[in-house]
């Protein structure tokens, strides 16, 4: 009888340890997604700052890739090719930067979009924010606006259980 009680306690302990291990693996995976997402958004934000003449082209360019279901196709002009880069307009550079960011995100199961930052609907100069989402959190967009309601509220509060990040770009 004592052996059965000891065996039961051991089984409960092993189950608890297994649950902790599963939670640790899940937390590690979430941290990896967040790190990768931040790197992608930071790279795109740096490209936006490096192309001040094309800043107004970025929101539409980024939103053009938000709802894709297959790997994005490259724009006709390769702005990172030294021979072609000198012919790129600021708007073409914005399109190519958006393509590279979404291509990188898509390859690891993420999607990006760009929209007015939450809480700036009445500001005279609206700050632009980049959003990246993964797993079950979806982002949708048209050429003129993005739907980030699965990620965060209009007040800038993350939706409970959402798997996304926001970064202010400019």
Task: Please provide the spans of the model-predicted regions.
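Flexible, low-complexity segments enriched in proline/glycine/serine and punctuated by aromatic residues
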Residues: 28, 32, 36-170
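Aliphatic-rich helix starts adjacent to a transmembrane/signal segment
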Residues: 1-42
């Amino acid at each position: 009888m004592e052996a059965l009680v000891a065996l039961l306690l051991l089984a409960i302990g092993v189950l608890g340890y297994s649950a902790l291990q599963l939670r640790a693996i899940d937390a590690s995976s979430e941290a990896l997604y967040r790190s990768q997402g931040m790197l992608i958004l930071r790279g795109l934000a740096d490209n936006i700052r490096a192309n001040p003449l094309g800043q107004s082209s970025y929101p539409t360019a980024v939103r053009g890739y938000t709802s894709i279901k297959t790997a994005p196709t490259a724009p006709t002009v390769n702005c990172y090719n030294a021979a072609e880069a000198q012919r790129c307009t600021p708007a073409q550079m914005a399109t190519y930067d958006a393509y590279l960011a979404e291509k990188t995100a898509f390859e690891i199961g993420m999607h990006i979009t760009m929209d007015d930052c939450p809480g700036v609907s009445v500001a005279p100069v609206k700050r632009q924010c980049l959003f990246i989402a993964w797993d079950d959190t979806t982002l949708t967009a048209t050429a003129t606006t993005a739907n980030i309601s699965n990620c965060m509220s209009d007040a800038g509060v993350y939706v409970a259980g959402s798997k996304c990040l926001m970064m202010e770009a400019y």
